[in-house]
Amino acid sequence: EDNKDKGAFYTPKEIVRYMCQESLIAYLETNTSIAKEKIRQFVLSPEEGVVGIPEIKKPKLLAALEEVKICDPAIGSGAFPMGLLNELLHCREVLSGEHYDRAEIKKSIIQNNIYGVDIEKGAVDIARLRFWLSIVVDEETPSPLPNLDYKIMQGNSLIESFMGVDLSKLTYEKEYKKDKGEISLFDDEKNRLQKTVSHLLSSYYSCSDHDRKVKLQQEISNSINKQLEAQAYNPSILAKLKEINLAENNK
């Protein structure tokens, strides 16, 4: 009854799998030069379909699978991302040959490919737990679980503001700076900050030391703030951004 009041409904596994497979097929058709029918056969049945993939194109196919980005804006209990985790895992196992670590492939997919948001904290906790359990079942020796704080987050994906800051206005910054002849400098700074954030997030994902995690959270917060400030040419937006501590809001 509570789920109905919130507009939350259970999606049958068959529907989840169908949607995940069709999404993956559409992505691979767009990002590889492999024939559509061969892509479809491969995704629907990797062990049989891989036979029709030319050897010379398999590295490109594997790279596309490793680079895909998936975001569920209303993740709920994580059914759709878990479905895509299984589809990606199956495809990558077949392309990896005989020597591969199933748990490590799962960790790689969760770290590099999957993101999710939900307005309900309980849903976020359940989704994170499902991903952790999916790793544990394939590990012979238990290892520290990855930190999913920046992978699956609580928030409202229907609005474009955070802590009173209208983030939609930041998208106009590039055009604004282009008009002022500052685009090259802006792009260089943006790329540098993006690389810094990516490096920090990668370190945080596998960090198990509490003090180090707290320090990394603050460094991530500072780097993201700098990136947002670089885009905020409006003085009022800039002032609001400086008041936000992302590390505190992520706890």
Explain the meaning of each model-derived region.
Residues 1-2:
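Conserved AdoMet
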Residues 5-251:
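SAM-dependent methyltransferase catalytic region
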